[in-house]
Amino acid sequence: ITTPDVPLLFFGTVFFILYKKFTEKQNFWNAVLLGISVALLFYSKYQAVLLVFFVVISNLKMLTKPYIYLAGIVTSLLMIPHLMWHIEHDFPTFQYHLVDRSEKFKIKYFLEYLPNQFAVFNPFILIPFVILLFKNKYQNLQEKAYYFVSVGFLVFFALTSLRGHVEPHWTVIASIPMMILFLQFIKEKPSWQKYVRTIV
C-alpha cells in the first residue's frame, strides 16, 4: 500500500457509510456530506473515479432523484481548484495515465496481474469470496454497490493489464466492499465461520 492509498481507504470507508445513509434517507445534509466525501476521494487518488462510477451504475434509479445532483454540485465546486491546476499545467496527470503509460499488448502483464491480486487480497479470502459471490445474491442497494465495486475493480484492471503494467495496490479500495460482503455471506454459515477462524 502506498501513501495515497491510506486516505483513499479512509475516505472510501466514509463514502460507503454516507452512501448508505443517503440511500436510506435523501435530504439536503446527506447529499452535501456525500458530495464532500466524493471530492475527498477524488483528491486522494484517481481510482476513486471508478469507485463512484461502479456505485452509480449499481443504482441508476438514483439519477432520477434531485438530491444526487446536489451531491454532484458540491463535489464539482470542491474540485474546482484541482481542475484549475490541471488547466494551468496542461493536464499532466491525464497525459501520463491516458497516453504515456499506454504500451503494446504483452501477455506477461496479465499473467502478473492474477498472482498480484492474490497477494493483495489473500488467496484464502479471494477464492472463497469469488465462490460465495456466485452462490449469493445481494439483498439491498448497499450490497449491490459492494458487488459492483468488488467485481468492477478486478475486471477493469484485468482488462487494463492487457495494455500495460498494473500495480498490485491499484485495486486495494475493493478490499472494503469485498470484506463487508464476505462477512455478510458467512454470518449465517457456521462451516464458513469455522474456515475463517481456522485458516484466515
Report the location of each language-model feature.
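Short acidic/glycine- and proline-prone juxtamembrane loop motifs at membrane-interface regions
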Residues: 1-7
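Membrane-interface transmembrane helices that cradle and orient dolichyl/undecaprenyl
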Residues: 15-30, 135-139
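Membrane-interfacial loop-to-transmembrane alpha-helix junctions, especially the N-terminal start
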Residues: 30, 67, 138-150, 196
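Helical-face signature of the major facilitator-like transporter fold
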Residues: 31, 35-39
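Transmembrane-lumen/periplasm boundary regions of multi-pass, lipid-linked membrane glycan transferases
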Residues: 40, 51-143, 155-161
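Transmembrane-helix signature of polytopic, lipid-linked glycan biosynthesis machinery
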Residues: 149-167
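Hydrophobic/aromatic-rich transmembrane helices and adjacent perimembrane loops
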Residues: 164-191
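Signature aromatic-anchored transmembrane alpha helix within multi-pass, membrane-resident enzymes
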Residues: 188-200
